[in-house]
């Protein structure tokens, strides 16, 4: 891994994807930058509760190979993301921020949301922290500890999608998954200076055996730096 560090807050998703598709920067280079960001900043912020950088680099190399062969890498090609730890991502334990689940077997397949994001070229770096079962507006738990707000380390980034929010607001990654029943996207967006929307029911399907929180009240969605970024991604994964 090189020593480049990219502040993803300075670029729109459209700019990042265009740079990858036009080979101004490779998906692997962008993933390396995100890895360096996490290695540099996450010891302080505690936004991620699990990472797999080797697999992320393999995903990025696959995106680059599609581009080099003239094939479609997806509308979100090369974007490094975090997955909220209420959501299945293949190879990672879905712990729900709970001691009850930290020793569960790793997920054997991606959730519908994660699968759609990967199909559009996103690179999964790891799982982002959440309060136990996503049931409060502050992100802390017993297994992984407290996530801090990058704008002021004495404050919370909110919850329950606080790990994703802290990772984006610090510039470590440009986008990540989230979910919202009683404010779990909207609260972190407000407290961390991001764009978040509680999507309509069914916009992004929820697996019947894997509700991400408050049952029928909860929907899946994203956090990003701008409304434009959020709209661009939702247009692709919420069809």
Can you annotate each of these PLM segments?
Residues 75-113:
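Enzymes and membrane/adaptor proteins characterized by extended Gly/Ser/Thr/Asp/Glu-rich
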Residues 1-58:
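An N-terminal boundary/leader segment
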Residues 34, 56, 78, 84, ...:
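Conserved hydrophobic/aromatic pocket- or pore-lining residues that grip, position, or stack substrates
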Residues 16-22, 82, 101-105, 218-225:
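Short, well-ordered beta-strand elements within core beta-sheets of diverse protein domains
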Residues 25-26, 72, 173:
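Conserved hydrophobic residue
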Residues 16-20, 63, 164:
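Generic hydrophobic alpha-helical segments
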Residues 63-80, 229:
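Immediate post-signal peptide segment of exported/extracytoplasmic ligand-binding proteins
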Residues 109-234:
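Short glycine/serine-rich loop segments
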């Amino acid at each position: 891994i090189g020593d480049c560090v990219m502040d993803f807050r300075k670029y729109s998703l459209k700019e990042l994807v265009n740079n990858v598709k036009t080979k101004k920067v490779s998906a692997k280079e962008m993933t390396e930058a995100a890895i360096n960001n996490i290695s540099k900043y996450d010891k302080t912020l505690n936004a991620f509760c699990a990472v797999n950088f080797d697999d992320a680099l393999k995903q990025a190399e696959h995106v680059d190979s599609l581009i080099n062969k003239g094939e479609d890498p997806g509308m979100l090609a090369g974007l490094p993301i975090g997955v909220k730890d209420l959501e299945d991502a293949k190879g990672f334990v879905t712990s729900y921020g709970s001691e009850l689940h930290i020793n569960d077997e790793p997920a054997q397949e991606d959730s519908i949301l994660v699968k759609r994001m990967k199909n559009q070229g996103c690179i999964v770096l790891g799982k982002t922290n959440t309060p136990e079962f996503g049931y409060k507006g502050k992100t802390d738990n017993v297994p992984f500890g407290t996530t801090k707000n990058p704008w002021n380390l004495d404050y919370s980034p909110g919850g329950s999608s606080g790990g994703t929010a802290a990772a984006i607001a610090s510039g470590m990654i440009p986008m990540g998954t989230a979910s919202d029943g009683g404010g779990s996207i909207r609260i972190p967006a407000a407290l961390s200076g991001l764009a978040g929307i509680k999507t309509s029911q069914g916009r992004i399907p929820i697996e019947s055996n894997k509700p991400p929180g408050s049952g029928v009240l909860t929907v899946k969605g994203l956090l990003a730096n701008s409304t434009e970024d959020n709209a661009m991604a939702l247009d692709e994964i919420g069809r």
